[in-house]
């Protein structure tokens, strides 16, 4: 995983050039938006269990066969695995948001995820639906439109961060 600073340094070093121009401007923007980014990650982390459990509940409401005998969420062990996977996905999305880079999400979470789910017989359409529900909830927390938020919101527009977190969830959905 490379953060915004490491990327700029590596790119400049490869060109044997000083850091300047648009790279420096982008880093200045990244720093000035840092508190919003930290707050956004905090909103997601502080509400992670609610985000995940609501997503899994929504997935099950739309497909009740998942909790019927033989369903992929039937038995406590399978339900716990489903919740755990949702927590892992959400955690890596928050890491990507913090770094401003999706490589940690792609390398450590999404690489081989679809193949694993197929091998285990996990219905990918239901999983993708749960991810979409998590996306909607996370975006609502970042933009301060969630009805049950637990933390105070810093002043400022977070629509760019909401769009960014949305793209990370889109990557998860498309990889499943």
Curated annotation (Swiss-Prot):
Any one cellular-component term (Gene Ontology): phycobilisome
Q: Which InterPro entries match?
A: Globin-like_sf, Phycobilisome_asu/bsu, Phycobilisome_asu/bsu_sf
Biological process annotations from GO: photosynthesis
Membrane topology type: Peripheral membrane protein
Binding, (2R,3E)-phycoerythrobilin 2:
158
Q: Does the keyword Nucleus apply?
A: no
Recorded hits in Gene3D superfamilies, A to Z, give: Phycocyanins
Q: Which residues bind (2R,3E)-phycoerythrobilin 1?
A: 82
Keyword annotations of the record? Antenna complex, Bile pigment, Chloroplast, Chromophore, Electron transport, Membrane, Methylation, Photosynthesis, Phycobilisome, Plastid, Thylakoid, Transport
- Indicate where this protein resides in the cell: Plastid, Chloroplast thylakoid membrane
- Alphabetized Pfam families for the sequence: Phycobilisome
The answer to keyword Plastid applying to this record is yes
What is the annotated quaternary arrangement, including any partners?
Heterodimer of an alpha and a beta chain.
Function, as annotated, reads: Light-harvesting photosynthetic bile pigment-protein from the phycobiliprotein complex.
Q: Which family does it belong to?
A: Belongs to the phycobiliprotein family.
- Name-wise, this protein is R-phycoerythrin beta chain
